Each structure stands twice: as structure tokens, then as C-alpha cells.
């Protein structure tokens, strides 16, 4: 056990602002954007190829980055950008997985953050309450993959954080991540 090597009386606290949950599926989102006509390639991509190597930026109107949620960037301006954003939001909100209906949430960053900084995406998508991992690679027969494009990984973030401690009552469910500072002040 990892704690056995620690000096006697050592206490350990593990805190995460997000929890963990089982991965239900993997979506090659750029593959889907290409099927829908929003993303174009300079040449036919190889299986699992990153989009940077093959995307035709002049003819593409949307491209996505993956992770535990998707970030979609619109390559258009004015009314065209508004229309593309509206259409993607509509399609992604009702997107179904091979196993059936999934809950997807599509946001503009300003809907989630008081202040949007840096090079923010135009849309952010949470697929199936973070149970479906969006990846940015392309070259697949289907946008729905059997597993993660970067190797084995069967879990994803969840919305609720967690904490674990070697002391006290770790069964509390009403604690917030910001409560950790006060908790540490009491025990240190």
C-alpha cells in the first residue's frame, strides 16, 4: 500500500475539482463534422490522423478539439458564423449514439463564464453528461469509435468533485471544493 512508506502520524488529503465516471463511448467529432460538410480535407486522412495534417482550412467552416468536452471553432464571419453556430448547436443537441439517445449540452462560452478570455471556442459541447469522449482525430469509417484514439482509457471527468482523507468523517456529501481551505485550517 502506498501509505506504508510514510512517516508515522502523516495525514493524507486528496482533493479533486472533478470526479470520475465510466466512459460510455468515443466520438470522433471532426469525422462527424466532415460527414455533415462543415469540415473539408486536403486529402483522404489515414486512420487516427490528427486534423492538423489534413484539414483544408480555406474550405472548412468548423473544426473541433477533443478532450473531456469538445471545443468547436467556427471558421466564418458575420451572418454565416451565426448560421453555422445555430445549425451545429441544433444537430449536436439531438445527436444520438449507436446505443440510443444521449444527453448533450451545447454552450457558447459566455453562457458559462462571466468573462471569456483568450482564444475561446465558439461552442463547447458536453456529450452524454461527460460520459462520451470527443476526440479530434479523423480517418475512421464511423464517427463512433470502439475506444479512445490515444490508447486504453475507460474513464472520464464527472461534474462532482471528490475528496478523501486519512482522518475525520470522509462520508460528508455536502462539502464544496472551496470548503477544503477551512477544513485544512481546522486540522493543521
What name fits each language-model region?
Residues 3-138:
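Secreted, luminal/periplasmic, and some membrane-associated catalytic domains
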Residues 5-8, 19, 25, 167-168, ...:
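…; additionally, a secondary subgroup of soluble metalloenzymes is captured
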Amino acid at each position: 500500500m502506498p501509505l506504508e512508506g510514510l512517516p508515522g502520524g502523516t495525514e493524507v488529503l486528496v482533493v479533486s475539482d472533478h470526479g470520475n465516471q465510466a466512459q460510455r463511448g468515443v466520438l470522433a467529432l471532426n469525422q462527424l463534422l466532415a460527414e455533415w460538410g462543415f469540415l473539408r480535407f486536403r486529402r483522404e486522412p489515414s486512420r487516427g490522423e490528427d486534423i492538423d495534417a489534413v484539414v483544408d482550412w480555406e474550405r472548412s467552416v468548423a473544426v473541433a478539439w477533443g478532450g473531456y468536452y469538445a471545443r468547436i471553432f467556427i471558421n466564418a464571419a458575420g451572418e454565416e458564423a451565426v448560421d453555422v453556430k445555430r445549425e451545429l448547436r441544433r444537430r449536436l443537441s439531438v445527436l444520438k449514439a449507436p446505443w440510443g439517445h444521449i444527453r448533450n449540452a451545447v454552450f457558447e462560452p459566455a453562457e458559462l463564464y462571466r468573462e471569456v478570455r483568450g482564444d475561446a471556442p465558439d461552442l463547447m459541447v458536453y456529450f452524454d453528461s461527460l460520459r462520451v469522449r470527443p476526440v479530434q482525430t479523423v480517418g475512421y469509417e464511423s464517427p463512433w469509435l470502439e475506444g479512445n484514439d490515444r490508447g486504453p482509457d475507460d474513464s472520464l471527468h464527472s461534474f462532482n468533485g471528490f475528496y478523501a482523507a486519512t482522518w475525520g468523517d470522509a462520508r460528508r456529501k455536502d462539502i464544496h471544493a472551496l470548503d477544503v481551505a477551512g477544513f485544512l485550517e481546522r486540522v493543521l
